[in-house]
Design a protein with these regions (language model features):
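Metal-associated gating/positioning segment near the N- to mid-region
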Residues: 2-69
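Alpha-helix-loop-beta-strand connector modules within alpha/beta enzyme cores
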Residues: 4, 55-73, 77, 119-136
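Active-site loop-to-helix "anion-binding N-cap" substructures in soluble metabolic enzymes
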Residues: 46-57, 61-68, 80-85, 91-93, ...
Length: 201
């Protein structure tokens, strides 16, 4: 007989609202499923909030969603949708409150540009915070998506083709170099789908 500690899942999406769709698991059902599989702690990726919202806004919203529901331990990755001095100050405040990681995006409407990425990584390094990143080249993806759409190529295989391994690898390379400029700011690449992308890590 062996006794091992409970698992920690650092990439969940409980109660996630994306447009008209909502994740099937909330903090009650998702945490029960996790516990049944031996996971005793999750760190949930919270969704984007309203445009220009504070970092605290989404953390507070997710505290409301999870309160008195989870049967296991949980925490959150914050989400950064834009960068300004107030956001950088909030990173400090949330870190002091126990939020030790933030997620940024290099694609989608709330992506950060390279200047914003630099500022966030710099602040995170100062704090000892980890930055999780969804790394894809947004501009190329949009061009490929438009190309396939015009050609009527809308089957699921073209979703993958519009997000080529090169789009992933380029973004991983770019953010890795920005982290190197900051003398190894800590990064967590949250989606890695190709050998080409892995080789850029």
């Amino acid at each position: 007989c062996y006794v091992i500690p409970g698992g920690i899942d650092v990439h969940t999406h409980f109660d996630l609202q994306a447009g008209a769709h909502r994740a099937v698991d909330d903090y009650y059902t998702g945490s029960i499923a996790a516990a049944c599989g031996g996971t005793t702690t999750i760190v949930d990726h919270i969704a984007f909030g309203p445009k220009e919202c504070s970092l605290h806004h989404q953390i507070n919203e997710y505290h409301k969603l999870s309160e008195d529901k989870s049967v296991i331990d949980y925490s959150f990755h914050g989400v950064i949708q834009h960068v300004n001095p107030s956001i950088l100050k909030e990173m400090e405040e949330l870190f002091e409150d126990g939020i030790t990681s933030m997620k940024i995006y290099m694609t989608y409407d709330d992506k950060l540009d390279d200047s914003g990425i630099y500022d966030v990584l710099k602040k995170a390094k100062e704090l000892g915070m980890i930055i999780a990143v969804h790394a894809e080249n947004d501009g190329v993806i949009n061009n490929l998506r438009e190309k396939y759409s015009k050609e009527g190529l809308l089957t699921p295989e073209y979703h993958g083709k519009s997000r080529s391994q090169e789009c992933e690898a380029e973004a991983i390379s770019r953010i890795s170099y920005i982290a190197d400029i900051l003398e190894d700011a800590p990064l967590y690449i949250v989606h890695l789908s190709s050998e080409t992308g892995l080789n850029e890590c």
